[in-house]
């Protein structure tokens, strides 16, 4: 879930590892990655990564892996399920240098399922039905992604 300024933002978005394609994506990456500073021994755990330094974001962009195309395909499947089957507004697939996607050894995505600053969306996200639909959409997207991979190999 995402907290955004104001209460007009709503919908889902899915991130894959990538270079910052917009100023907004760079700001999201900086904000999301800043939480590592709260951890004990973050410099050791993250090999000197400092979300405040531009060099760290350049380093993240260099770690775009061979799994990038597969990550994008999985992210597209998730957004398709959210829009067509779950009835959510899709804010699209985006790329950003998010630490949670760094150095993965498999396709990886970060799914933002909604904005808690939007009152109706917060209510939906807190409901059992909303949680079931969101989880079901992610499951179907992964199942379809897996079936596509197996059919092409």
Where are these regions (language model features)?
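Active-site-proximal helix/loop segments of hydrolytic enzymes
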Residues: 1-153
């Amino acid at each position: 879930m995402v907290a955004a300024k104001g209460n007009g933002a709503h919908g889902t978005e899915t991130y894959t590892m990538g270079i910052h394609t917009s100023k907004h994506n760079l700001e999201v990456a900086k904000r999301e990655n800043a939480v590592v500073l709260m951890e004990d021994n973050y410099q050791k755990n993250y090999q000197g990564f400092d979300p405040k330094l531009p060099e760290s974001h350049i380093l993240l962009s260099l770690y775009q892996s061979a799994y990038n195309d597969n990550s994008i395909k999985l992210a597209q499947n998730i957004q398709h399920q959210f829009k067509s089957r779950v009835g959510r507004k899709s804010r699209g697939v985006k790329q950003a240098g998010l630490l949670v996607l760094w150095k993965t050894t498999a396709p990886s995505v970060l799914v933002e399922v909604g904005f808690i600053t939007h009152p109706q969306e917060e209510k939906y996200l807190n409901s059992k039905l909303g949680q079931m639909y969101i989880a079901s959409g992610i499951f179907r997207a992964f199942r379809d992604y897996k079936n596509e991979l197996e059919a092409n190999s």
